[in-house]
């Protein structure tokens, strides 16, 4: 949570800087009434379209009572049969209006629109549009804090995981290097998401002033969002090349993985930014009601599908090898593939659910909670599966914990127990290898194989140094 507090301080600085850069704009009253101007433009446009529709549509023959088509000031109503209640969705002119709710207008049996008993004028019932406004605001705040907590937990777990990977040199190998880059992409994404949530989405002044910095932040956010999924694809490609294509090759060139993980997401992010500036240039690019987001989501979905294909093919190959040879190395590879195979559907399920948002208020609220959990707790999930549940990491931590107990144990009994435990752990390290090897081949990093690193620990004159 300390990380979250520091990010909030950074966010405050970001907001002050953004507002300071637009101080001259705030001196003009037009920005104060920005929302009023937008609302007025929407209403005028809707009124113009309504009158055009009224003039173009053919009139019905009056064989039965009929309420005439009309414009009520906010919405356009078609001809309605007598005794029928006409309905349509609430307009999005005002922030406290819920477009999922319905407006009603009653056509009386006489063929006249309902007159309000107090004003004695035709009346449309808009009361349901803001009936649940307070509940919607509470839900929005709950989702806001749910996202902040999710990214705070993700940041904490990811930074701890990166600390473990960098501190323990026995874990250094190409596969762990890919893990580090994947974790780092999630760290950066969580940081920029917290900045956007607190400095932009939750600050109407920044959104109304529409500084360039908030659009740049949105661009960085979408770029890093793509990096998350393409580094997951790198994990799948690496395992597929190692196990299927190169038949347990010793070493791969990581430069191509860096280009795919950090370089390729720049392409859809840049195309989206250019298209957004020309075709849907809303304030801070904060709206999600545009099909231009498919420029970002399309490559991500493709990466998920390709990754799933690679992983299923890897599982097929490993199962075949296990049936034929019963090699222990194949079993070790299966454990690594299993972790990635679990993550891919979990990280991609949001795109399966995205088109199926329900219409009802309660069901829509449940949907929003599920989507926020799936989206904002991904970093925590990745750190848990790839680091905290990793047998190699657990073995290394257990061994160093036992070394600590031996060095700082307060009694002979504790020293003896820790020594026996350390001896058992050291012998088990040969079973849980830091990096996989097949037929004597070892994955190398920085000129030193992982077997060599483990061997140097086990053969040292002072194993606890």
From Swiss-Prot:
By its UniProt entry, which InterPro entries does this protein fall under?
GPCR_2, GPCR_2-like_7TM, GPCR_2_calcitonin_rcpt_fam, GPCR_2_CGRP1_rcpt, GPCR_2_extracell_dom_sf, GPCR_2_extracellular_dom, GPCR_2_secretin-like, GPCR_2_secretin-like_CS
Extracellular-facing ranges: 21-141, 201-211, 276-291, 354-368
Q: Which ranges of this chain reside in the Cytoplasmic compartment per its record?
A: 167-177, 241-254, 317-331, 390-465
Sugar-bearing residue positions? 22, 68, 120, 125
Q: Could you tell me where this protein is found in the cell?
A: Cell membrane
Signal peptide stretch: 1-20
Task: Give a brief account of the tissues where this protein occurs.
Answer: Detected in gill, brain, heart, intestine and testis.
**First-listed, main subcellular location of the protein, grouped into a coarse class:** membrane
Q: Where are the bilayer-spanning segments? A: 142-166, 178-200, 212-240, 255-275, 292-316, 332-353, 369-389
Q: Would the keyword Lyase be found if you checked this record's keyword annotation?
A: no
Which Gene Ontology BP terms does the record give? adenylate cyclase-activating G protein-coupled receptor signaling pathway; angiogenesis; cell surface receptor signaling pathway
**SUPFAM superfamilies with a match to the protein in the record:** Family A G protein-coupled receptor-like, Hormone receptor domain
Question: Which residue pairs form cystines in this protein?
Answer: 50-76, 67-107, 90-129
Q: How does the protein associate with the membrane?
A: Multi-pass membrane protein
Gene Ontology cellular-component terms listed? plasma membrane
The molecular function GO annotations come to: adrenomedullin receptor activity; calcitonin gene-related peptide receptor activity; calcitonin receptor activity
Q: Which UniProt keywords apply?
A: Cell membrane, Disulfide bond, G-protein coupled receptor, Glycoprotein, Membrane, Receptor, Signal, Transducer, Transmembrane, Transmembrane helix
Pfam families (alphabetical): 7tm_2, HRM
Q: Which domain of life is it from?
A: Eukaryota
Role according to the record: May function as G protein-coupled receptor for calcitonin-gene-related peptides and adrenomedullin. Specificity may be modulated by accessory proteins. May activate cAMP-dependent pathway.
Family membership: Belongs to the G-protein coupled receptor 2 family.
Q: What is this protein called?
A: Calcitonin gene-related peptide type 1 receptor
Q: Which organism is it from?
A: Paralichthys olivaceus
